[in-house]
Amino acid sequence: MAEKIYDVTIIGGGPAGMFASFYCGLHELDAQLIESLPQLGGQVGALYPEKQVWDVAGMPGVTGHDLIAKLEEQMAVAPIDQFLGETVEDVIKGDDGTFTIKSAKRVSRSRAVIIALGNGAFTPRKLALEGAAEIEGKQLSYFVNHKADYADKRVAILGGGDSAIDIALMLEPVAKEVHLVHRRDQFRGLEHTVTQLKQSSVQLDTPFLPRALTVEDDETVTLDLKKMRSDDEAQLNVDKIVVNYGFTSNNAALNQWSLDLAAEHNLIKVDSMMETSTEGVYAIGDGVTYPGKVALIAAGFGEAPTAVTALAKKLYPDKRMAMHSSSMGITK
């Protein structure tokens, strides 16, 4: 029996990889998707299931959980093979132009590869205060999985970017009170959400920096705050702390692969067809760079069909490729 060779292997099961999977299915490409986590969704599904996502056209204020559920529903219309809980350890390009994909579980082959790894492995930037580690997972968290955990609680959110603002606005309707502690007077969020924040009941503690925390009992925590460029101090007694200082990420595993991919600032460089410096290897999502690139889910949704269509034309140059899903006769 001849060895199976896929047309396409998608590495990464975040939103961009999921949408690429759907488009491979639409074009009836023999494809597989490999994801290291035991479920699809990537960072959006793992870290922000309750957070509102606003940059997806036609889906205002969809939660991360609901967005991933919709993408899974879409993938089921034109399914491809999925291998979850499997980390790709190496990708090797052979002399015949095909690729060998190695994981700890198996070895497979493919005629083309789409890398959709986002920013790679991600870990939250931790609150560097004595005692913070001891209450992590109790009074202190780095992301919000369930809004109900914050119902009728006094909550302090530490941070000043888009995600911190989104969390504050998300918890405002359910929490007893919400404080947003930021070391600057200005916030780094989108103008519209900053306006919403200023019109909300969220209490803005700026420009303050947390200097110490004290666990008063098994339930509450006191935060000692120091005003920037001043000797003024303040205290907050809260039930819950959410730290949102961003995440550190890396694609260290990618650097171990037997591929020579041109990169810039640890991002994979691609051309207008989303192809990398290695022919047959495409890359999409937050882990790529090109002139004008914006790191948004919406951008990844545009890059996925670009990559799939480009590689499909190369693999099957004589096949007429329908460009619009409305012309493909799809039925649910």
UniProtKB/Swiss-Prot annotation:
Family annotation (SUPFAM superfamilies): FAD/NAD(P)-binding domain
TM helices/strands, residue ranges: none
MF-aspect GO terms: ferredoxin-NADP+ reductase activity; flavin adenine dinucleotide binding; NADP binding
Cofactor annotation remark: Binds 1 FAD per subunit.
Family of the protein in this entry: Belongs to the ferredoxin--NADP reductase type 2 family.
Catalyzed reactions per annotation: 2 reduced [2Fe-2S]-[ferredoxin] + NADP(+) + H(+) = 2 oxidized [2Fe-2S]-[ferredoxin] + NADPH
Assembly and binders: Homodimer.
Pfam families recorded: Pyr_redox_2
Protein name per the record: Ferredoxin--NADP reductase
Keyword annotations of the record: FAD, Flavoprotein, NADP, Oxidoreductase
Coiled-coil ranges (or none): none
UniProt xrefs under InterPro entries: FAD/NAD-bd_sf, FAD/NAD-binding_dom, Fd--NADP_Rdtase_type_2, Ferredoxin-NADP_redctase_2
Cofactor: FAD
Annotated FAD binding sites: E35, Q43, Y48, V88, F122, D286, S326
EC number: 1.18.1.2
Organism of origin: Limosilactobacillus reuteri (strain DSM 20016) (Lactobacillus reuteri)
Enzyme class of the recorded protein, top EC level: oxidoreductase
